[in-house]
């Protein structure tokens, strides 16, 4: 079975695989059909955006473990997803490098033993720059990440630290901790993928080369660890491992994430949707780089919060934010 979002793309695929025993499905109905396939025990959620919410809920209700590579699902609907997963007895296994590192560092320890989650960030390509130096940043500059090779949107998000803001929100739901227990640490070498500090002062971290194959494989085969060829971390080659505080004044997209999560309700959805729209406009060269956090802040300031939004209200909030930014006429 294969799913394509548009009917046109599905028709094209059907013609290409006509001589194969492959069923081609389309749209949200297609995603939902794939999500609950009885043959599968684990659903890898790797779609981009809030389109992942409904299939993830359907898979959980069908008793499937979730390998989660879609931040938006927990950012916007964590209050729905995590209680449902607990009720159904299914595991939410993080695929994100940082959240996988935290998951591995926790190793089943009770929540009460966690003092702090240390969420690492590379700092992106503009680490150390002032807001004045960021005024004339072009799309090409922002698409050069120092350590990771990723898609266009997430690379821009990493440069603004909004990606780290989304990861803070995701960590709050995944690990059931208070927002103030999540500390972002800039670690330019991306060797320590994240860590957990316990109530006795011990810090347990997961280290490795910057390679997404490890967290992906770990989520797919959990609780097993399997042989994986590839470059190993050589401590003798590590010239230095450094840490800094994030600059939340220059890169205030990260601060806005903490603000949105503290407010709660539908505000994290506003943060996420406004960023998606703003990044799209920047990639289309319709707004300046520094307008990305400005648009997020403006969208948050004009929003009337809905407490405990259901899925329909989450999607309506997303649409209203898109409409608000469209109305600015960029």
Give the predicted meaning of each segment:
Residues 1-330:
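Catalytic, metal-anchored helix/loop core of enzyme active sites in primary metabolism
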